[in-house]
């Protein structure tokens, strides 16, 4: 049975995003969260990694782009932290399970539970219904959106970071492992904004230069009134077109908002930009979604 109806497909093409209920069962969500707790419990944080992740553009360049740890994380499982979770000596000032912004970017390759969800029959069915011929998996992330400190994610388009020629070949699958409501930082979209192209790209700088990445162009200013909330219940998912403008507010509630998200690219007749921060490696070529 198809996960998407014809009406769903049309809505996704018209608006650039689609909320789906029940992609995962509550038990599957809980299993992913338990496995993530085990990963955190055993994590060994390198000294240089006690640099904090930021969603602010300048901070993002300074901390992520300048750090080899980030730019070489495409084929690894690595840890990125919220602001203010370390003291001056690099020690945790909050419980370590509450310190993380995200873990990325190869859970889909190296963690069996996450791999199973990524390649699930439902996800494959969605891609076939969207007429994807040879979709590959680019990256995956576990995003925590910690209670009280989970930072705002400013308006952006995924194609800024995951650029292809032609455009329109990348889709995010954003799976809520807990209820994602307005109170704890659900996604907001500008419907139809995926038709307007992109105005900014994050690119690798020439070898031997610093920082390791830079931005070309600038993000447009968006009217806040154009954004529509996309709350989703535990186990539901949001399909995200690579050019649709979206954001999420800071999580000021006392409830976390754990999410597993991954990006898919239609590789048929598509050029993946060699300037993107994320590149396939010998250790991990972009794996085919279809099994």
Curated annotation (Swiss-Prot):
UniProt entry keywords in alphabetical sequence: Dioxygenase, Iron, Metal-binding, Oxidoreductase
Cysteine-cysteine disulfides: none
EC number: 1.14.11.-
Keyword Iron set for record: yes
InterPro entries in the record: Phytyl_CoA_dOase-like
Binding, Fe cation: 156, 158, 246
Family, as annotated: Belongs to the PhyH family. PHYHD1 subfamily.
Job of this protein: 2-oxoglutarate(2OG)-dependent dioxygenase that catalyzes the conversion of 2-oxoglutarate to succinate and CO(2) in an iron-dependent manner. However, does not couple 2OG turnover to the hydroxylation of acyl-coenzyme A derivatives, implying that it is not directly involved in phytanoyl coenzyme-A metabolism. Does not show detectable activity towards fatty acid CoA thioesters.
Name of protein: Phytanoyl-CoA dioxygenase domain-containing protein 1
Organism from which the protein derives: Danio rerio
